[in-house]
Amino acid sequence: MLCAIYKSKKKEGMYLYVAKRDYFDEVPETLKMAFGTPNFVMLFNLLGEKKLVRAENQEVLKHIQEQGFYLQMPPKQESLFEQFKAEQKAKQTKNKTALKVR
């Protein structure tokens, strides 16, 4: 089964999969508004050998068959502050270990 994949211009990393190109009748109005104007990316064969990167082909197919679309949300980004704290902690641990060796 071919599906059409669109990316959102409003939200980086958000993609909408529908059964046919330019067919959005099954997509709720609230989702259409939140998604913004869809930007066509490509047609994709869900039953082919290629795998989607961030979704399971069978899961996408099931959602399209049951509700007419599949919405892929952007990956969760770690807080930059949390990432900074983890890096600082790693540096401190490394420095303490280096001091003990001397």
Swiss-Prot record:
Protein's name according to its UniProt entry: YcgL domain-containing protein MS1047
One Pfam family it belongs to: YcgL
HAMAP family xref list: UPF0745
Organism from which the protein derives: Mannheimia succiniciproducens (strain KCTC 0769BP / MBEL55E)
Sequence ranges assigned to domain YcgL in this UniProt record: 1-85
PROSITE patterns with a match to the protein in the record: YCGL
Family annotation (PANTHER family): PROTEIN YCGL
